[in-house]
Regions:
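A short, glycine-centered helix-capping/turn motif at helix boundaries
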Residues: 15
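C-terminal catalytic core of tyrosine-transesterase DNA break-rejoin enzymes
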Residues: 119
Length: 150
């Protein structure tokens, strides 16, 4: 797999467990696994479509899983699908993700849901369901599109 110019990396208390629940919930595929001499995960990468995510353990006082810092997060990871979002949500729920927002149609034409993994990382998952013009999006949302509407 060719590397993207930008890749997210998440840390977990139990990164090996994270590999399993990310595969079960989202269908991510383990593409790289590096262990130290004691069999502890040193680095892992999981592929999804044309993207990848890096998974690792906590490695300093400033690099922690949300599970180690009272659930606080500074980022959300977004997954873009071309599949049945409702079925995907049920798969995530069955794998142990907490569903924070059930699948819902959005003003911009996607159907999305939000979830939290067992260590507290937030994920948003969306799939396009219809094309929406700028005028329609603005009228529906009350927001002003300034740049970049596709």
């Amino acid at each position: 797999m060719q590397r993207a110019a930008l890749t997210s990396a998440l840390c977990y208390r139990d990164a090996k467990a994270a590999l399993n629940f990310l595969e079960a919930a989202f269908g991510f595929e383990l593409t790289m696994l590096i262990e130290d001499n004691d069999g502890k995960l040193a680095h892992a990468e999981m592929g999804f479509g044309d993207s990848l995510i890096m998974i690792g353990n906590e490695w300093s006082q400033m690099h922690k899983s949300p599970a180690s810092i009272d659930g606080f997060n500074t980022q959300t990871v977004h997954i873009h699908l071309d599949a049945d979002i409702d079925a995907h949500c049920e798969r995530a729920r069955a794998a142990g993700f907490e569903i924070l927002m059930e699948p819902e149609d959005q003003f911009y034409g996607d159907r999305t849901y939000r979830c939290r993994d067992p260590e507290g990382h937030f994920w948003t998952v969306g799939a396009p369901i219809r094309s929406v013009s700028v005028d329609e999006a603005e009228a529906t949302s009350g927001l002003k599109v300034v740049k970049g509407w596709a």
